[in-house]
């Protein structure tokens, strides 16, 4: 297993790639929330923990939190992000 960090900015439609979005626009969602991301991870059967009082490094003034996910070593972060985005928004 490996751990990875998922910030809401990674799947946020209003962000550009330079601002931190990691998925293509066609997968991105409007205003992703930690609870929605956590709900998708739970449905996917992945183990996770939520860190609420953390700020995204590119926006240090905005406290948005992140999710730490435990995933199989063969699963990429992009695969997980795309799966989270399905049927969201």
From Swiss-Prot:
Coiled coil feature spans: none
InterPro entries: Signal_recog_particle_SRP19, SRP19-like_sf, SRP19_arc-type
SUPFAM superfamilies named in the record: SRP19
GO molecular function terms attached to this record: 7S RNA binding
Location in or out of the cell: Cytoplasm
Top-level taxon of origin: Archaea
Stored PANTHER family: SIGNAL RECOGNITION PARTICLE 19 KD PROTEIN (PTHR17453), SIGNAL RECOGNITION PARTICLE 19 KDA PROTEIN (PTHR17453:SF0)
Family: Belongs to the SRP19 family.
Protein name from the UniProt record: Signal recognition particle 19 kDa protein
Species name: Methanococcus maripaludis (strain C5 / ATCC BAA-1333)
Lineage of the organism: Archaea, Methanobacteriati, Methanobacteriota, Methanomada group, Methanococci
Gene coding for it: srp19
